[in-house]
């Protein structure tokens, strides 16, 4: 099984920046049934092996991916190159009808020393995920508690948006960390939503939780006016990557990884048949 992922504790780079991870979109949108694994062909029998081969060629340190209850869990795990580090989302905008059973199935497929995220972005709410923040957080807690009872369980990270420092932004992560099942805190930070500099976000998160920190999602959408308005010095995706790495170094926080999300230019959520959003990795994708 290709279960081995990041060392514990995760290791940042010695120059104050973070190693790059490839983030593969793996959700299913509740309002229109758009399965992003299908629309990007990120499937074991399709382009998934090629996607990983190209990501490795680009020098990434690992990836984020997903184990949807609608897909063959074992086939997805085994499609990853042997020994390549992956953090697996167990739920990504598509709640399984039986979350506990899904958690057990994922843990059995992953084996020892794996990393997982129980529920992606529990704070985003019903409009995006189909779940209220409370329900999504409760689901994550049940899944992690179930995993803790198994003889073999993954280490868990969190993954939630942190674009400002209002107390409300910490609510879901506070509950998850308080459970005692979390080994790393993930910060999602996008330029079109950012209201606080990233270095302040990272320092606040590191000081609050005293756990390893990673940037679980960040990226740049070419031509998105809100992003250009907030960061007029950023011209393109390479500039955004440099900006994020500079903010990591400025924070002084040893960030375990920087996940570029999504790695592939993304089919439009509401109209996947017509073009792709220019937001994937600025180097060769796949």
Residue ranges of model-derived segments:
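Active-site region of glycoside hydrolase catalytic domains
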Residues: 2-16, 21, 83-229, 243-286
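Short polar catalytic/cofactor-binding loops
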Residues: 24-30
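Short beta-strand segments enriched in hydrophobic/aromatic residues
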Residues: 26, 67-69, 189, 220
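Acidic/histidine-rich helix-loop elements
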Residues: 30-42
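Catalytic domains of carbohydrate-active enzymes, especially glycoside hydrolases
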Residues: 42-68, 85, 180, 184-185
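Catalytic-core regions built around general acid/base machinery
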Residues: 75-83
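Short secondary-structure subsegments characteristic of cysteine-rich extracellular domains
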Residues: 233-240
């Amino acid at each position: 099984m290709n279960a081995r992922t990041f060392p514990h504790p995760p290791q940042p780079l010695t120059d104050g920046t973070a190693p790059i991870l490839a983030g593969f979109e793996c959700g299913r949108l509740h309002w229109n049934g758009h399965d992003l694994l299908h629309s990007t062909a990120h499937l074991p029998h399709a382009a998934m092996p090629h996607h990983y081969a190209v990501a490795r060629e680009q020098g990434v340190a690992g990836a984020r991916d997903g184990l949807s209850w609608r897909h063959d869990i074992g086939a997805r795990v085994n499609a990853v190159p042997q020994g390549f580090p992956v953090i697996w989302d167990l739920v990504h905008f598509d709640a399984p009808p039986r979350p506990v059973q899904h958690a057990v199935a994922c843990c059995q497929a992953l084996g020892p020393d794996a990393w997982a995220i129980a529920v992606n972005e529990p704070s985003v709410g019903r409009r995006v995920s189909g779940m209220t923040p409370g329900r999504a957080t409760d689901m994550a807690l049940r899944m992690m508690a179930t995993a803790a009872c198994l003889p073999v369980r993954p280490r868990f990270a969190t993954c939630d948006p942190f674009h400002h420092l209002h107390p409300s932004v910490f609510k879901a992560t506070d509950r998850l960390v308080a459970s005692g099942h979390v080994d790393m805190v993930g910060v999602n930070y996008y330029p079109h939503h950012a209201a606080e500099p990233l270095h302040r976000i990272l320092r606040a998160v590191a000081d609050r939780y005293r756990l390893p920190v990673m940037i679980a999602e960040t990226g740049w959408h070419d031509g998105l006016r809100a992003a250009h308005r907030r960061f007029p010095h950023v011209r393109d995706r390479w500039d955004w990557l440099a900006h994020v790495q500079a903010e990591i170094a400025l924070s002084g926080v040893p960030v375990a990884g920087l996940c570029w999300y999504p790695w592939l230019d993304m089919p439009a959520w509401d109209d996947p048949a017509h073009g792709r959003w220019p937001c994937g990795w600025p180097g060769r994708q796949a």
